[in-house]
Amino acid sequence: MRLQKVYDDEIGELCDTINYMSDEISRTERMKNDFISSVSHELRTPLTAIDGWSETLLTGGGTNPEEVRQGLEIIHKESRRLTRMVEELLDFARMESGRMKLEVETFDLEMELYEAVYMYENLLAGSGMTLAYHTEETELYFMNGDRHRMKQVFLNIIDNAAKYGKSGGRIEIDLRHADKDIVVCVRDFGAGIPEAELPFVKERFYKGSSKERGSGIGLSITDEIVKLHGGKLEIRSKQGEGTAVYVSVPAIDVHTALGVETSIAAEENVDESL
């Protein structure tokens, strides 16, 4: 329902504000309904594959060893996909209720990024898509935060790059220091994001005009995790050229970090000697 603006005074401004809020509520409600529909579809797809191949193998189908291996690979892949989707939904619930917490420690961010890259190198093997990873080998990238959550950030961003990147194309990942921050850039060379959609891509439930299906909450969760670390998630994109996602988080002094690492190692040695 919209209010009719009659006068250009304070009452008129109030009408404009109420109408804007009403439009936003309607837009969010539509996005939420689309989200529920998308999640239902996204859950059904891996479940169908798992159920179909499980039944085939249990009823004696796939007597050829290669076919059995293929079936088991599909079950494994779809199970992991399903697990990630459920974890994403749980994270969204925690985020909405303000219960998303960090297990803070001092750690080397490069190790978490490298593990995420290594995982996707294996997942993309045979797809024709390649990952190019670059960092300064002499640099150290220590920070205070939740190592598992930061790895989740990188997995989500690389997953998006693989999903929206050009088939058989390239994903570039760069790690560097910028002032007092650590900056990670993940770049694909796919279709890119329309300029009109860029302001909304981090909103919950937002999916844009892409034909790729998804829950519409992955990027909003990623953004929230980065914010909890005192960092910033920035997206730059140009249609027809691709998308670059920048993650900036506060670095800590290398000497401080190494002091913490040494202290932890010393405590572990004392515990072992007791």
Feature map (PLM): residue ranges:
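HAMP signal relay modules and closely related sensory coiled-coil linkers
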Residues: 1-20
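A conserved beta-strand-to-alpha-helix junction within the catalytic ATP-binding
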Residues: 12, 103-121, 131
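Membrane-proximal coiled-coil signaling linkers
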Residues: 25-66, 70-74
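Short alpha-helical segment of the dimerization/phosphotransfer core of two-component systems
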Residues: 74-82
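Conserved micro-motifs of the catalytic ATP-binding
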Residues: 97-102, 140-145
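Short conserved segment of the HATPase_c
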Residues: 193-205
